[in-house]
Regions:
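Non-catalytic substrate-recognition and accessory regions of acyl/acetyltransferase enzymes
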Residues: 1-69, 87-91, 105-188
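Conserved acetyl-CoA-binding loop-helix of GNAT-fold acetyltransferases
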Residues: 68-84, 92
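Conserved beta-strand-loop-alpha-helix junction that forms the acyl-donor binding cleft
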Residues: 92-103
């Protein structure tokens, strides 16, 4: 989809080869509107709500490009994943611009993106705006750092552009969703 979007031809973008490899090997499973991949985390996660040691296997969540993501889509996909991956700790992990703390300044909390984001506890941030810029301005014809010419067709584009023009950075965040994890019920 992205290659067709950017170049008007179907194909694979270089950055997608690593992801495609995991998809072909059957490591990533699409369930409803989301994609899931059991994956060991490469760091320990210490949050007030939970501690996860390094190499804990979680369900990595990928949000593929496509139609708008609704709350019902998210709940349905999570429920399917809980059944499909029965036996894996029901904690979802996501590394995405969709969890960026800067979204709090760009969007109203009632938006679909914020509804997705609110389920996640953020444990680390990456100062890499590439994914954020690529997804928010997919039609840009200018250099990634030429913020002045970025479109302002949506509330998100308008507000994120103002952050960039003020010298702020848009971050990618890593987070976990523990709302389906109930250790007292022995749900693993």
């Amino acid at each position: 989809i992205l290659c067709h979007h950017y170049f008007n031809v179907y194909g694979i973008l270089p950055m997608m080869w690593m992801f495609l490899d995991r998809l072909i090997e059957g490591k990533i499973t699409r369930l409803g509107r989301l994609e899931f991949e059991p994956k060991a985390i490469d760091c320990e996660i210490r949050l007030p709500e939970i501690y996860l040691p390094k190499n804990s296997v979680l369900l990595n969540v990928h949000v593929p490009a496509g139609p708008r993501l609704t709350s019902a889509d998210i709940t349905d996909a999570y429920q399917q994943a809980l059944h499909y991956f029965n036996g894996i700790v029901p904690i979802f992990h996501c590394s995405s611009w969709l969890l960026s703390p800067q979204l709090d300044e760009c969007l109203d909390e009632s938006t679909r993106i914020m509804q997705f984001k609110k389920d996640y506890l953020i444990y680390s941030l990456e100062d890499n705006a590439d994914q954020f810029i690529e997804r928010v301005w997919p039609d840009r014809e200018n250099e990634a750092s030429d913020y002045v010419n970025y479109e302002e067709n949506t509330t998100l584009q308008k507000n994120a552009k103002q952050l960039l023009l003020s010298g702020r950075i848009l971050q990618k965040a890593n987070g976990i969703c523990i709302k389906y994890y109930h250790p007292e019920s022995d749900n693993v």
